[in-house]
Amino acid sequence: MSSTPHDPFYSSPFGPFYRRHAPYMVQPEYRIYEMNKRLQTRTEDSDNLWWDAFATEFFEDDATLTLSFCLEDGPKRYTIGRTLIPRYFSTVFEGGVTDLYYILKHSKESYHNSSITVDCDQCTMVTQHGKPMFTKVCTEGRLILEFTFDDLMRIKTWHFTIRQYRELLPRSILAMHAQDPQVLEQLSKNITRMGLTNFTLNYLRLCVILEPMQELMSRHKTYNLSPRDCLKTCLFQKWQRMVAPPAEPTRQTTTKRRKRKNSTNNASNSNAGNNATSAYNRKKVPAASLNLSNQVPFPTTKKCIGDKTRVRRNYRGIRNGLDVMVVGEPTLMGGEFGDEDERLITRLENTQYDAANGMDDEEDFNSSPALGNNSPWNSKPPPNAETKSDNPTQQASQ
């Protein structure tokens, strides 16, 4: 029995160590883990360029960061933009924090067309303080993150709602200063407010003023204007936006389409024709009383036989009030024709019906599929009906 060479890179799926062959998409929660690792690589010499690079890596250009918590004087809510986010993280470490990381438990992810939302109701922001005494602060709350659905997967919105916080001290420190009441009193005081240092809180209060001034600062850097001129320009543009009427939505130009006549018109025309025919059968009046040309327009052609001229109707169904379709030019490349592209079809007004000249068309007319079985045109005229004149033009002149 020949033995096959053993593959050192082969891993059985049923073995204790299963190797994943295809890499999966990076989970949004893993981005928080990467952000924690990046914060751990921070040094004391990290300048503004390092913090700008940090914010560019994990936050979108139009990202916003919101903090909500409740202080002694009431609830607070601070929202800062992308330009102020790097400074926010730097103030955390400038306030005496030596380490910062976030822990997410039981987070829920929801995928949308262009974003991924992570909702974690049990988020803990852990900060370690070295001054005045080693203290570990655990700030608990709800963190809602919105990531972009792309390869970078950067944060668009960051909303952290703080519920409670705890400040933890090592037992060894308490045992060392157990006999010193002044030190114990100092250790019993909180070093943070809702898990945030006074340095960070002061910066958030300053952001209330700085955030509306971002437009002035960017205009000053772009156009090199004085602060007073920047303020005048911004106020004038804001006034223009308030005074300007709302823009109307653009309407798409639609080409004209040919429409068939309404069914109500067809029904009225049919009723008019039936009423005229019943009156003809009842009173035995000439067929000239039924003027079809005034009810339904139709195209006609002339046919000359000797010195007599008669009219032959091209569409048999129009005598019963049916629709008349207009012949259009062939459509090229999906184009549509409007009113100016239609053929000009002329017609001849015929005020009376010539029964003598229509004898040769009677058979074809009665067998037309456009007529129904109960149509009055299929019934034979009464034997004692009056004979019409051969020349319709003479009767029209009378």
Swiss-Prot record:
<dbReference type="GO" id="GO:0045944">
    <property type="term" value="P:positive regulation of transcription by RNA polymerase II"/>
</dbReference>
<comment type="function">
    <text>Binds to the LIM domain of a wide variety of LIM domain-containing transcription factors.</text>
</comment>
<dbReference type="Pfam" id="PF17916">
    <property type="entry name" value="LID"/>
</dbReference>
<dbReference type="InterPro" id="IPR041363">
    <property type="entry name" value="LID"/>
</dbReference>
<dbReference type="GO" id="GO:0005667">
    <property type="term" value="C:transcription regulator complex"/>
</dbReference>
<feature type="region of interest" description="Disordered">
    <location>
        <begin position="354"/>
        <end position="398"/>
    </location>
</feature>
<protein>
    <recommendedName>
        <fullName>LIM domain-binding protein 2</fullName>
    </recommendedName>
</protein>
<dbReference type="InterPro" id="IPR029005">
    <property type="entry name" value="LIM-bd/SEUSS"/>
</dbReference>
<feature type="region of interest" description="Disordered">
    <location>
        <begin position="245"/>
        <end position="280"/>
    </location>
</feature>
<dbReference type="Pfam" id="PF01803">
    <property type="entry name" value="LIM_bind"/>
</dbReference>
<dbReference type="GO" id="GO:0003712">
    <property type="term" value="F:transcription coregulator activity"/>
</dbReference>
<feature type="compositionally biased region" description="Low complexity">
    <location>
        <begin position="263"/>
        <end position="279"/>
    </location>
</feature>
<dbReference type="GO" id="GO:0007399">
    <property type="term" value="P:nervous system development"/>
</dbReference>
<dbReference type="GO" id="GO:0005634">
    <property type="term" value="C:nucleus"/>
</dbReference>
<dbReference type="GO" id="GO:0030274">
    <property type="term" value="F:LIM domain binding"/>
</dbReference>
<comment type="similarity">
    <text>Belongs to the LDB family.</text>
</comment>
<dbReference type="GO" id="GO:0000122">
    <property type="term" value="P:negative regulation of transcription by RNA polymerase II"/>
</dbReference>
<keyword id="KW-0539">Nucleus</keyword>
<feature type="domain" description="LIM interaction domain (LID)">
    <location>
        <begin position="323"/>
        <end position="362"/>
    </location>
</feature>
